[in-house]
């Protein structure tokens, strides 16, 4: 019911109203495009990155991650793919999970969306999460408990990426993340119809009013959001970001992908 009452409100207004859930999600339409949005208070909730299991095998599916968390008495309140990867699902850029680095920071321009600089890093630290432009991240020496690099940046210090064209006909399903200046407010978005980079970035800057935002990926993008009765199936993913909460032993079966 809350979703109907909040329909059409900026998520920053709608979801900072004392809701008990670890993550709040809603579907909305902005400037003619449809999106699913999930917002997290990083100062209160547990965000994690997932790539490999204890044997070093890529997990790659929401259901596989759920199986791992079940042993901890935890479950996914939300999850989505989080950064670009090679065909073997290894990260293209910086990847750190719980203090262990698998891949170094990549600072040079290159091919594809990842190399469309400026790109950036999604950095998880105690009580906060930040999107930081790659060269600024390198210069700052920021130590992240977990981090994933992707690109391009969507919003840099309140400005759209300089290469984005308003009338571009390059339209795909896209997902990404934006963060507030204090690192508390984190909003994940996935489009429900194909959008160009300009439209997607404008969602974060103009509607969500977030000063930093980072693109995660395109047509492979998937979302696990029990709030929306949604858990997308598909090919194996690389890095995944999720919000973790205690498993309720009285609840029904978890959505499977």
Residue ranges: model-predicted function:
Residues 7-15:
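Bacterial N-terminal signal peptides
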């Amino acid at each position: 019911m809350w979703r109907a009452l909040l329909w059409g409100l900026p998520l920053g207004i709608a979801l900072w109203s004392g809701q008990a859930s670890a993550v709040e999600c809603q579907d909305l339409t902005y400037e003619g495009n449809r999106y699913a949005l999930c917002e997290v208070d990083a100062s209160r909730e547990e965000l994690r990155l997932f790539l490999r299991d204890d044997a070093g095998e890529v997990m790659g599916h929401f259901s596989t991650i759920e199986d791992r968390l079940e042993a901890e008495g935890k479950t996914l309140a939300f999850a989505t793919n989080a950064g670009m990867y090679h065909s073997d699902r290894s990260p293209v850029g910086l990847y750190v999970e719980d203090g262990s680095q698998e891949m170094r920071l990549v600072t040079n321009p290159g091919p594809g969306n990842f190399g469309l600089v400026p790109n950036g890093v999604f950095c998880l630290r105690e009580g906060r999460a930040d999107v930081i432009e790659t060269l600024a991240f390198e210069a700052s020496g920021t130590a992240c408990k977990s981090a994933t690099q992707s690109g391009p940046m969507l919003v840099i210090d309140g400005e759209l990426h300089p290469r984005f064209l308003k009338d571009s006909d390059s339209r795909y399903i896209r997902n990404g993340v934006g963060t507030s200046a204090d690192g508390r407010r984190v909003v994940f978005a996935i489009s429900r119809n194909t959008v160009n980079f300009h439209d997607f970035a404008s969602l974060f800057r103009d509607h969500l009013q977030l000063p930093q935002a980072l693109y995660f990926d395109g047509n492979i993008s998937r979302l696990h959001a029990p709030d929306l009765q949604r858990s997308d199936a598909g090919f194996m993913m690389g890095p995944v970001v999720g919000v973790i909460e205690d498993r309720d032993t009285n609840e029904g079966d978890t959505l499977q992908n």
